[in-house]
């Protein structure tokens, strides 16, 4: 595992992380990244990762409930249609036709997977997630320059591309190709809150 830091991060923050690695999470390699911002660090990480899957999490999230990470990896290995499993920052709510405000405006049960509750979603987001690296490198990276999106972002170009394909071809057909899931069942709990007490995830 690798932890990347933005170059602006203060020394005490880095010391806190290193203390955790030394005393609780042995075996984690800490890399002081020269990049600044989410996109260049994400891009560097996914291109240098030596495992089939990558866990991405920024420093400012509070994970509210336990996550069965080994089971997530088992499911992603078994089912080739599962490419992204993210922790929802809202409950896996009923469908809401307001995609400009809430990315998970479609949530559906996934009956093909019995080992773990996952919810099919219309969202691509970079809140904490496990991603299948081959899917990103073989397909999704080519959407990062999607017209009309912020090209300094990972999330927005991919979300806009995913949403537009859903509008053109329908959710089920497009989801079968993209394979984006929320952790937990439909109407399940939210798993995240921002540590900065921002409004993100409050709706």
Where is each model-derived feature located?
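C-terminal catalytic/acceptor-binding lobe
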Residues: 124, 128-203
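Conserved donor-nucleotide/metal-binding helix-loop-beta segment in metal-dependent transferases, i.e.
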Residues: 66-88
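Short beta-strand-to-loop acidic/aromatic patch adjacent to the donor-nucleotide binding site
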Residues: 52-62
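A recurrent flexible, glycine/aromatic-enriched loop bordering the glycosyltransferase active site
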Residues: 92, 110-131
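Active-site nucleotide-sugar/metal-binding loop of Leloir-type enzymes
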Residues: 43-53
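A short, glycine-/small-residue-rich helix N-cap motif at loop->alpha-helix starts
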Residues: 33-41, 64
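Acidic donor-binding segment of Leloir-type glycosyltransferases
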Residues: 1-30
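Short beta-strand-to-loop element that shapes/binds the nucleotide-sugar donor at the catalytic cleft/hinge
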Residues: 83-99
């Amino acid at each position: 595992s690798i932890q990347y830091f933005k170059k602006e991060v203060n020394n005490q923050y880095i010391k806190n992380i290193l203390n955790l690695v030394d005393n609780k999470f042995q075996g984690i390699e800490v890399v002081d990244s020269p990049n600044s911002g989410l996109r260049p660090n994400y891009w560097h990480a996914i291109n240098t990762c030596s495992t089939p899957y990558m866990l991405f999490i920024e420093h400012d999230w509070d994970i509210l409930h336990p996550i069965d990470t080994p089971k997530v990896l088992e499911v992603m290995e078994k089912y080739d249609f599962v490419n992204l499993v993210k922790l929802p920052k809202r409950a896996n709510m009923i469908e809401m036709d307001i995609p400009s405000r809430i990315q998970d405006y479609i949530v559906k049960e996934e009956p093909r997977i019995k080992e773990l509750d996952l919810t099919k979603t219309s969202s691509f987001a970079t809140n904490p997630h496990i991603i299948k690296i081959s899917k990103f490198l073989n397909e999704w990276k080519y959407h990062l320059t999607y017209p009309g999106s912020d090209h300094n972002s990972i999330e927005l170009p991919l979300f806009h591309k995913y949403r537009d394909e859903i509008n053109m071809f329908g959710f089920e057909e497009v989801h079968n190709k993209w394979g984006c899931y929320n952790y937990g069942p439909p109407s399940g709990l939210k798993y995240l809150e921002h540590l900065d007490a921002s409004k993100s995830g409050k709706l």
